[in-house]
């Protein structure tokens, strides 16, 4: 049976089609679903439930125009209206993928890094990290080199050799992974100890480097993380875009 994938969109999402096509090429059964369909505020035939899917994807874009902060409005809407459903979805062991704006949304929700609470309760956790304005203070859009750092915890990347360097596109203005100073050392160590770091920015030699190789100034060159269980992957890099034909 093909896995069923819910690709969530609202006003401002703009990468749902490339994400849909990427999963379609892999043989999955993917569907682009508007938030209103999950909230049940559409005609009955158009309504959807997270229970119908095996994977939730929040793709890239500028959800709700990224007003207030990138991903903040969509995070609040999901948390307020679908908190129980998200908790049940995670508690059942279903994976979640957040790409770029999806990364921003799920961090805003407090789901990741996910220290301290069982997975089914993390949607009510206090926010533990943030994605802030790039150090360059401008939108960064170009090919980027990332190194796969995970030792096998992340279910999404278990087929990628540790140390493999990938060339992927970045496109963001608020991509700097940030942890407040008083918690920074402890949280970064937890990310390492829990095998939660999935991707880091590198230069062509595979060495951690600053701008322009690190396009945003992310702490510890972090480009992607997962939850302690490895079932939720957040990638700032547009990992679905290279599958799109030109």
Q: Predicted segments — roles?
A:
Residues 30-31, 96, 232:
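Hydrophobic anchor at the start of a short beta-strand
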Residues 237, 241-246:
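Single conserved hydrophobic/aromatic residue that forms the stacking wall/gate
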Residues 5, 167-171, 233-236:
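Active-site-proximal beta-strand elements of phosphoester/diester hydrolases
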Residues 1-72, 156-158, 164-167, 176-184:
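Extended, subdomain-level signal for the structured scaffold at the beginning of enzyme domains
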Residues 64-153:
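Cysteine-nucleophile active-site neighborhood
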Residues 221-227:
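Short, surface-exposed beta-strand/loop micro-motifs that present aromatic residues
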Residues 112-219:
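Pocket-forming structural segment of enzyme catalytic cores
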Residues 162-165, 227-232:
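Beta-strand-turn-beta hairpins that frame and shape the catalytic cleft
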């Amino acid at each position: 049976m093909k896995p069923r994938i819910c690709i969530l969109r609202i006003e401002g999402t703009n990468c749902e089609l490339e994400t849909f096509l990427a999963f379609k090429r892999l043989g999955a059964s993917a569907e682009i679903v508007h938030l209103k369909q999950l909230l049940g505020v559409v005609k009955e035939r158009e309504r959807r439930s997270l229970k119908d899917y095996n994977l939730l994807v929040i793709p890239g874009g500028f959800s709700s125009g990224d007003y207030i902060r990138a991903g903040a409005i969509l995070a609040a809407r999901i948390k307020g209206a679908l908190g129980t459903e998200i908790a049940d979805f995670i508690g059942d062991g279903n994976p979640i993928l957040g790409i770029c704006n999806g990364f921003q949304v799920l961090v805003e929700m407090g789901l990741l890094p996910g220290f301290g609470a069982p997975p089914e309760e993390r949607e009510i956790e206090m926010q533990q990290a943030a994605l802030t304005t790039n150090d360059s203070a401008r939108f960064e859009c170009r090919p980027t080199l990332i190194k796969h750092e995970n030792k096998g915890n992340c279910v999404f990347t278990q087929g990628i050799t540790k140390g493999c360097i990938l060339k992927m596109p970045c496109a963001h203005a608020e991509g700097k992974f940030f942890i407040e100073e008083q918690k920074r050392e402890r949280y970064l160590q937890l990310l390492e100890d829990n095998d939660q770091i999935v991707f880091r920015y590198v230069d062509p030699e595979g060495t951690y480097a600053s701008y322009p190789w690190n396009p945003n100034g992310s702490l510890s060159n972090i480009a992607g993380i997962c939850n302690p269980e490895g079932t939720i992957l957040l990638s700032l890099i547009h990992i679905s875009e290279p599958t799109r034909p030109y």
